[in-house]
UniProtKB/Swiss-Prot annotation:
Source taxonomy: Eukaryota, Metazoa, Chordata, Craniata, Vertebrata
Keyword ATP-binding on entry: no
UniProt superkingdom: Eukaryota
Matches recorded under Pfam families: KRAB (PF01352), zf-C2H2 (PF00096), zf-C2H2_6 (PF13912)
Zn finger spans (C2H2-type): 183-205, 211-233, 239-261, 267-289, 295-317, 323-345, 351-373, 379-401, 407-429, 435-457, 463-485, 491-513, 519-541, 547-569, 575-597
Protein family: Belongs to the krueppel C2H2-type zinc-finger protein family.
Primary residence: nucleus
Cellular compartment(s): Nucleus
Protein name from the UniProt record: Zinc finger protein 283
Cross-link Glycyl lysine isopeptide (Lys-Gly) (interchain with G-Cter in SUMO2): where in chain: K256, K452, K564
InterPro entries per record: KRAB, KRAB_dom_sf, Znf_C2H2_sf, Znf_C2H2_type
GO MF annotation list: DNA-binding transcription factor activity, RNA polymerase II-specific; RNA polymerase II transcription regulatory region sequence-specific DNA binding; zinc ion binding
Role description: May be involved in transcriptional regulation.
Species per Swiss-Prot/TrEMBL record: Macaca fascicularis
TM annotation in the entry: none
Amino acid sequence: MGSLRHAWFNTSFSFPSSGFSGFCASPIEESHGALISSCNSRTMTDGLVTFRDVAIDFSQEEWECLDPAQRDLYVDVMLENYSNLVSLDLESTTYETKKIFSEKDIFEINFSQWEMKEKSKTLGLEASIFRNNWKCKSIFKGLKGCQEGYFSQMIISYEEIPSYRKSKSLTPHQSIHNTEKPYVYKERVNACSHGSKLVQHKRTHTAEKHFECKECGKNYLSAYQLNVHQRFHTGEKPYECKECGKTFSWGSSLVKHERIHTGEKPYECKECGKAFSRGYHLTQHQKIHIGVKSYKCKECGKAFFWGSSLAKHEIIHTGEKPYQCKECGKAFSRGYQLTQHQKIHTGKKPYECKICGKAFCWGYQLTRHQIFHTGEKPYECKECGKAFNCGSSLIQHARIHTGEKPYECKECGKAFSRGYHLSQHQKIHTGEKPFECKECGKAFSWGSSLVKHERVHTGEKSHECKECGKNFCSGYQLTRHQVFHTGEKPYECKECGKAFNCGSSLVQHERIHTGEKPYECKECGKAFSRGYHLTQHQKIHTGEKPFKCKECGKAFSWGSSLIKHERVHTNEKTYGCKDCGKAFGSGYQLSVHQRFHTGEKLYQCKEFGKTFTHGSKLVHERTCNDKPYKYKECGEAFLWTTYSNEKIDTDETL
């Protein structure tokens, strides 16, 4: 075989052996065995292990003589030897402590590229070993070398050049100068710029995972991946944001987080010009333009743009909730939901709006809030022209037009257009109310409801209407209010043609025609078309009146009733009729009043065909035709027992 080249390594590390088969007693096998035996038998005091024992050089003619099996074995052995030597570079501190080489000399093993004609496979291995520094060879001055056969050694003298403390810093740096990726794995066309990366890449095909976590038993391809994973168990977060103090497990997470404060969005969509702070978000966004939904749910057939969305969706079918809050015991289907929930207990709000000073628990809330200041709404519905500030809102809105309701309740069979609505609905069946108000003790099923409720006590109304100056507790209330000024009503009832300013109002209205009442009181059996009405009704049984007027002390069961009552004291009437100028204290009263001008009569009695402007009048009419209280003496019927008693007292029935 060809001549051997020298490369010296000072080491006492041993390598795990692995068997090779294919042909007997080949020099290639001896090379691998020599590396193991040399490293196992020698100690620090024995001296140096030479690469002479483990490296084999072939000439062009000799290489041609090898059969395919021998060439494959050669590749496997040399890759393993190389990866073992690379592991020394990453772990050993020998080079820092022992003065083996002069600072003017570098011993470099340079394995030139070779190519197999039968298979598309290339290999290039190179490593630089010296005492303190790893130097970038691309800018060496006075490069001198010799090449004899397929592998060569270069001894280089160098001047002042950029240096790197560890090989893992130098190796990625060298790839900047040459975009060459000489390592190609035969299973698929996937090029790697470093031999060690090829070794790691091969493990993805062989499913080989040597690094096991002692905490949970999970296996990983590399020691780096294991170290990253272990931070979940230790809770280590060494990277801290100087702006808000939030800590992160990884530096990359800190870099991404800092963009929230700086507002930097380097990733721009070429289709619509929208910019993102993360490349991942741009990739997700671009799928909206393409319209490709390649991930399909086997359970319900729903398709998704991204695999992560499919994985999250499938949890709805399984009902799995592996993430549990240690504070209140509440379980979640996703880790990020648990993280969000825990902030309710801590009260931490690190994300502050620079415009109005409002603070938020999560960065995405701040991002969405900032859109209220800019008024930007780039996502427009092709069906009705309504615009939205985020793509997810447009997708959810589109379901109103299509009627799609993929989320079904297993208890009552009711379907919803959003998974969030299903989660909220399910709490009606369980009666779960984990969120309690510290002020009045009232409990809520959802954290958002508690936040809104607390504003009743604090009186906080941070959302102001620019048209009339009226303030609201939430952005949602402000959005609904603004429709009164614009008069926009894009949602129309197919049954009677009535239009509404929001889709939820249309859904609730349609129940008048269908007679559907899915919300039933467990106390008295009375059913309601809206969950909100059931909640209000239940207070009749409990007698609960937590909302008290500061002016006169009158108590109410519901916050909305208190707000309406307070207008009696202030005489506030902000809703004016454009037809006659009459003002009203609430938007509902204005809507009812306007029917006198339009002559609109939406409510029809099925018994006699008579129509009414208000539902309450229809109910009254039905009651008039049903007189359950009869006077035994003459048989006259009455609506209420008080009337029959009065007639008895005055002897009118005698």
